[in-house]
Swiss-Prot record:
Organism: Psychrobacter arcticus (strain DSM 17307 / VKM B-2377 / 273-4)
Transmembrane segments: none
Protein name as annotated: DNA-directed RNA polymerase subunit beta'
Broadest EC class assigned to this enzyme: transferase
Record-listed Mg(2+) binding positions: D462, D464, D466
Family: Belongs to the RNA polymerase beta' chain family.
One GO CC term on file: DNA-directed RNA polymerase complex
Amino acid sequence: MKDLLDIMQSPTSNGNHEFDSIQITLASPDVIKSWSHGEVKKPETINYRTFKPERDGLFCAKIFGPVKDFECLCGKYKRRKFQGVICEKCGVEVTTAKVRRDRMGHIDLASPVAHIWFLKSLPSRIGLLLDMTLRDIERVLYFESYIVTEPGLTSLEKYQLLDDEDYYKALEEFGDEFTAKMGAEAVQDLLKDIDLDLEIDELREAIPQTGSETKLKKMSKRLKLLEAFRNSNNKPEWMVMNILPVLPPDLRPLVPLEGGRFATSDLNDLYRRVINRNNRLKRLLELSAPDIIVRNEKRMLQESVDALLDNGRRGRAITGSNKRPLKSLADMIKGKQGRFRQNLLGKRVDYSGRSVIVVGPTLRLHQCGLPKKMALELFKPFTYNKLLSHGLATTIKAAKKMVEREEPQVWDMLAMVIREHPVLLNRAPTLHRLGLQAFEPVLIEGKAIQLHPLVCTAFNADFDGDQMAVHVPLTLEAQLESRALMMSTNNILSPANGEPIIVPSQDVVLGLYYISRSSVNAKGEGMIFATVNEALRAIGSNDLHVNAKIKVRVTETHIDDDGNRTKETSIKDTVAGRLLIWNIMPVGMSFDECNEEMTKKNISKLINSCYRKVGVKESVMFADQLMYLGFAQATLSGVSIGIDDMVIPPLKKQIIEVAEAEVREIEDQFEQGFVTAGERYNKVVDIWSRTNDKVAKAMMDNLATDKIINAKGEEEEQKSFNSIFIMSDSGARGSAAQIRQLAGMRGLMAKPDGSIIETPIKANFREGLTVLQYFISTHGARKGLADTALKTANSGYLTRRLVDVAQDLVITSDDCGTEQGLLMKPHIQGGEIIEKLGELVLGRVTARDVTYNDDAEKILIPAGTLIDEHWVKVLDNNAIDDIWARSVITCEIEHGVCSQCYGRDLARGHKVNIGESVGVMAAQSIGEPGTQLTMRTFHVGGAASSASVDNSISVRSAGQAHFENMKTVQHTDGHLVIVSRSAEIALTDELGRERERYKVPYGSSVLIKDEEQVEGGQTIAKWDPHTHPIITEFAGTARFSEITDGLTATVKVDDATGMSSFEILATRDRSSSAKDLRPAIILNTDEGKEVIYFLPAETIIRVSDGEKVAAGSILGRVPQASSGTKDITGGLPRVADLFEARRPKDHAIMAEMSGVVSFGKETKGKNRFIITNEDGEIHEELIPKWRQINVFENETVARGEVIADGPQNPHDILRLKGQTALADYIVNEVQDVYRLQGVKINDKHIEVIIRQMLRKVEITDGGDSNHFKGDQVEYADIKALNAKLEAEDKFPVQFERQLLGITKASLATESFISAASFQETTRVLTAAAVTGKVDELRGLKENVVVGRLIPAGTGLAYHKARKEKAEQKLQDKDLNAAFDMSATTDSKDFASFDEAFAQELNQGNH
């Protein structure tokens, strides 16, 4: 293997393979000439009679090299001995035919041609340099107008466009004092004339003076481009070509088909076109043809070169004979079928095969069954080797013959070869890393691959015709990696959430569940056994039924943290069958873990606890044994489905009759006009969905229990042994919803647009459906299938974007030493805790010391501790509410992440290793469940939304209440009224652990005091959900200002009470004279101050003029528009929106700074909202009038507080509240979507993606750097730059963190290779070429593209070693230089030499 690597690394004919970076630049005419081996002068390709390439044509052997190895075209020189000879007759060099793949030619263009990429790829680089519009440049290039290139002493301006008429006029007027040209020639001259240094200096002076934003943007763009040209040594005139390179002929082949036709690459057509036009143009110029003809020919040449480079970018695409657009050079590299994605990132692999999979229930977890035929083919070379080394064959040829005849010895050799040589199995689509795992092959007859049932979950495989691919790791290193890292036994835990993925399902669960269930009056009930073995013997001899309840003496072994073992014996009440499970459990587990009904959840818990307690090896063996036991017992249990198992509940008829009566009643009300059509529909749908639930409940109650006569002859109820119930209850197959359709009623169906059909299907499948019912149900079924197809594509695209943005994130060091982190709190929704603190911080490292609640000096957990299961218990027992934990987002390493900030590797259960590619892992973990998410937008309307309005808070459990952020006033009635916006009430238990937390709206009445003890179920706060109160915080006298009936207000009389009150009119409803009046209540407080409350439109005033009011009184109420039907984006589209950082429509408006609120003069459709802070700074913004503003005049708001409700805008959260708040928001929102589908993903994965979204910053002030306001720069670069500036006592750069969506972030990555292979290839490559960008090959993708080991996992060490070797070389070079210097010195120079040597050494070390 080492020799192989040496061969690969040895210098070959084309120089050394080793390189550290790749640069892309514009090619100058000289460079193109230097690549070329000759000029292509003729459009001919090959002679159709002799099939020999034409001389000077597109396939010319003289230019590009011989067609056959070591043979010239005319046949004078054949064979290897003439290598390097150039034939005198045909001019062909005698060499390998392979050179036709890399020898290029060129075409000398008769007139310059602009490169379409730099012209049309937006922003147009030529346009930006010349500071002209694209439209104008095109008019010049395509010969519509002249452009003045040299105005001389005339009144014309440089860059002025002249049409024919103007040009001839100017000629008459000025003669030849000026120069004006057209075509690419003119553009080339103008580009040549640009003095980069001068332009740059002018712009640098002009930029600080500009006031307008748009001008500033344009100027800084232009300046950037000019500097890029200056720094990259690209010359602007190179964007116009005088010489066109020709691709080597073997990369644009011409293949003869039968029948004398040829299949050819489209490029040949395109080149032929260019050559024809070029030759014609040369002839016309020699003949000095009329200007108009030459012009037309030049234009056609420009168009043909455009088509060759990028067909269809300008005008209509040129089509071939079959009406299809021809594939140009640009099309070759972009898109899914382009070079990047088809050939560089997705190669096909040798030594592989694929076949159908079948189940292998007798295999061990690390094995797979490989068909003999397949194994023989895959391991052929290895088998030849064994045959030779064992002397069974003398030559390779003989061995080959033996293998072809399939002689008996061959199989023995194959078995030896295969022994302990793992193979990789892969099932497409490979959505996460567990879709490719290593197994040891076991030779089997037949043609199908056998797969172990427990790995099906990871592969998402089933046996209904799925196929899988087999790959053979050839080298020793590859075999080692397969065994150590990819073996199925080393991948027990899922990388997404750290829980076991090797969990039995379906039949196995059914078998285990059956034997762990107890049954009354089973054979052997009540027996008592001295040992487990006795009981097992009784089961074996049929004296004891597996479902019988018995007592047995059990000996358990406990292992403590230090590995000490203690034994404990006790008598347990159990079910006989559970002893079968106990019998295979590893030593160190407790009996209670298997002494319960083995549902799928419990089995998963059992395997998880086994892994944590006794490690990988035991767990794998246990999982295998569980599977064998489950399969055997499922067979013995005889569970099967009969039609009588679907028991229809006797109550069903009665329940449905009641519902029908209710529906009739509503129909009557509708006919009499008491309810609207919408209300009727909502109520009917409501009734039927309630009815469906009632039927389902009756059915489940009926199914779930059996009545049975026990040993004493009494009737007692027990859990049912109905087959369908057993399957559903164990989690093996089917759900309550499916059983409901079999034996309950099918219920309401949806139309394809998602709306519900109000006629339900009252029948179930057992009763059978009528034609109409069947017809209704086809809607839903078909929509389901269509949805699935759509979902798969969308989910795949999301995964691709995620992988692309995160691919270069790798663990690069052990500790970055940061003290930053995120503050972790339990996740709370609707008052209850969904995720405990322990679950959130498990596997993370503490960023700061965790101290005791009652004593902040005493340290409970020191900073830098990895929190494992033991520490989680400590946290729970000490009632810790929040922890500062390290996070990927706050990691301070320049490239990659450090292992302390990442914490535990979820798939291995220990601290993450250096080199683990956490980025790709995160992307896969988030993308893989994507297909399980829904695609739909939820319409919450009518009955559903009206019920969900809360108007009070009742606590669930007893505890002590704590008020947070709460500002209250005491009302005269004694209760407190809240006058702050973000008030919360938290509830803690007797240990001080937070149990519940509630947000309390503004204006609520709080019915308890701070720190008061409350009972479970007690109401602690209430409010009116339909109005928004205006509350006074002071007592005093109310006085009306500008509130006049008919002008700014109207009098409303309440029908029920007969009381009248004022209602403020909206500005649009007032007469013109009253438009500018601002109705308000002025409160003269008892302290003698004046407080003004401005009243928004539609306020209903609750006090009268001159009335005395108490503190906490309500002055007025603003009705809340009931939020009708809102569409909630759910599922996959929601996740995509969050990661793309899209700004939601009508998003929440947040306070830009802390201060006091006031309202300025209104405009036509907007309110002027003003915040004044303590220093008197003012922030103004205009808010549309239809937005409901939550705050009133003179209220104090904090920065980032919500002023107008709506969906949150992540960019605002980042700007106003910082990155911790942003991380919390995105993590929680994404998790809510996944949680709804019951998918568990660790928060760390989402944080990894957020880190990548926060890579860039926007500069707000360039300081003493050469950056400008508005530049987008990498965060890491700016940090390094600022450190440097501060060290030199200069002004650092001021910047704001930016949040980029994942697509934008992928395209903005430092590596142009990675960006180009993702999307918008043309744009990325154009931008990179102009700036002469260097790709440092840091990420995974770039390295795959150039064909190196990736800098992750085992490849990271290889790259580190390479780097160290390079640095060593540099140091040696410096030393040698120092010694060379000493050779030329005199003895008296020795002192100075020593200094020089020391300096050299120091430089070398840096």
